[in-house]
Amino acid sequence: MPKKTRRNLLMAAGALLATALFVPVVSSGASAETAAVVTPASAAQPNIVGGNEAKLADYPYAVYLTDLDGNQFCGAVIISRTAVATAAHCALSMPRTKMHVVAGRQDKRSGGGVDTSVSRTWVQPDYTDPGQGDDIAVLTVRGILPYQPAKIAGQSDSELYSPGTKATVLGWGRIADGGARSDYLRSAVVPLVTDRSCTTSYGNYDPKKMVCAGYESGGTDACQGDSGGPLVVGDTLIGIVSWGEGCAKAGKPGVYTRVSAYADDLTREMSARILG
């Protein structure tokens, strides 16, 4: 079964095409409009399965991305008052001018919070597809995000990545593999998995660029629509939802971008500011 990223595929007109088993990975130089529907063997996509509704007051840095019609397709996380981090495959899924960041909105159907456009996009230069790692990007927004940013895990925070550490994944994605998307922010607690175990699950797993989290028996995971969202320990960002095989499958943990490997990049990019 092909692995998949955890982003919802949108047609240029905004119609949803994504299914639980086949979702696109936008490769280098490709757009969401031209990407193939079946993902390459190296990569896979997530919503919170097995979790619960969460209060945005507890996770004010959790945000999501939409197209111009308001269709949510990925998650993201506030890292400064003017920038959010997300997955590279989310940032590349459509032109910057057609992408919005929605913050401070627990229920997607409400009109609260801040809805802002993107003025600048930075994608990790080595990114080619989620299964190869480097699946991280920073979006600089127009205006100010008046919410608490997440802390960024650094190279010295290795203890946060200890196997068994309980982390929280957040998102508005599907609540079952192939099921309905959530209107509300959801959270789930998942333990970090050993690198050895994750390598057994996924032959292309790279412990320098990725981290795995999930239960051996499955049941709790990110899913389609959660890509780009945060994996946190306390209020420290340690991972970005990237890929996996199915959602909440036994022996197939979720794979996240290892934030500490890109801390310097994030620190540099979150201070970039383009007005207008």
Kindly give the residue locations of the regions a language model identified.
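Protease-domain processing segments flanking chymotrypsin-fold serine proteases, especially trypsin-like
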Residues: P2-A85, S93-M94, K98-R105, T121, ...
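Structural detector of coil-to-beta-strand junctions
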Residues: P60-A62, G75-A76, P149, V211, ...
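Structural recognition of the beta-strand scaffold that forms the well-ordered cores
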Residues: A62-L65, V84-A85, H100, A137-V138, ...
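Catalytic nucleophile loop of clan PA
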Residues: V77-I78, L160-S162, G219-V241
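Chymotrypsin/trypsin-fold serine protease catalytic domain
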Residues: D107-G111, D115-T121, G133-G218, V259-D264
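Extracellular collagen-like Gly-X-Y triple-helix signature, i.e., selective recognition
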Residues: G244-G276
